[in-house]
Amino acid sequence: MLRKHIKIESARWYYHCDRLGMLVWQDAVSGGGTDGEYNAWTTNRKPTLIRSTWNKFRDDTAKHFTALGADDPIYRRDWSRTCDAMVHMLGGHPSIVTWTLFNEGWGQFDACDAAERIHALDPTRPIDATSGWYDQHCGDYHSVHNYFRPLEIYPDKGPLRGYVAEFEKKHRRRRRAAHYVVLPVARHGVRAFVISEFGGLAQLVPEHAAVSRAYGYGEYDSIDDWRAAVRSVLASAAALESRGLAGYVYTQVSDVEEELNGLLTYDRRVDKFAE
């Protein structure tokens, strides 16, 4: 599975995913901010340092619009139109199995309203309304990013909202009617818990990078040490499957312009993981 992160590719890319049977989580393009910048405390430092904020920070008031870089009404209108257009344009590709709406609070606003609207446009695919943090208790996933803490499954706190709340009611009625009990790992047992970003371990390959210094997580004396660290964090994620983890997305397939945490180099000429 690939998560196409905050960008849309050409039709050719999706054609090849369709042809190969690759599953794609498609992100909406992020926007908002002031001159392309977000409030570093709200969208990065606070959720990194204080995990308890993830389920408590709203996104549907003027105050929160400003904090999340979504205070411009023209931006909010344009983002909504663009997100709808993405679903219309790409909805015919069977490779796409999830729509991701907001990432790490960047320009996030009214995530539950957005999830309801996209669900009405395409009821066939699950929706990751808020990937990373600032969960609004809606959409089909409880979706977190975890780069700095031991990997674990967090309980789904708070009453669910929107179409998934209606699904939960029906689910409970069916369970009562069938006279059986399910003991879910998450509190509600309706939304899937996913770690939608983790890892991000950096390794520079000289002459195959767009930047000269590594941006990513961890420092390794050799590429063998880096490979061992990648295997370890992947094994930690896989071990959570038996406890209810529904999926995970390692960061990332390749180095990009300012990051050296890919499994492939920026020019795609070196597979760092190949021994």
Task: For each feature predicted by the language model, list its residue ranges.
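A polyampholytic, Gly/Pro-enriched intrinsically disordered region
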Residues: N146-D156
